[in-house]
Amino acid sequence: MALTKEEKKQIIEKFRLNENDSGSPEVQIALLTERIKRLTEHLKVHKKDYHSRVGLLKMIGRRRKLLKYLQEKDFERYKKLIQELGLRK
């Protein structure tokens, strides 16, 4: 369920803005999106795992806040990110 160091590293390299970047909104949103996808798959199998469902809802809320921040701060970066992650239709 959790991301390995290698998987985190790949996501950070793909979405970072410069070579030392690991905390920009893009990177944080991409990492949260991957964790959300994995937890969603887990919950499809384990339907009664309510504790994990609460954690999933918290992650979704955190991602929503970061997306809202990025949308207000730089709309072009926001549009590019949601297209790369496939979040909106």
From Swiss-Prot:
GO terms for biological process: translation. One of its GO terms (cellular component) is cytosolic small ribosomal subunit. SMART domains: Ribosomal_S15. GO terms for molecular function: rRNA binding; structural constituent of ribosome. Coiled coil: none annotated. Keywords: Ribonucleoprotein, Ribosomal protein, RNA-binding, rRNA-binding. The keyword Nucleotidyltransferase does not apply. CDD domains: Ribosomal_S15p_S13e. Belongs to the universal ribosomal protein uS15 family. This is Small ribosomal subunit protein uS15. It comes from Dictyoglomus thermophilum (strain ATCC 35947 / DSM 3960 / H-6-12). The lineage of its organism: Bacteria, Pseudomonadati, Dictyoglomota, Dictyoglomia, Dictyoglomales.
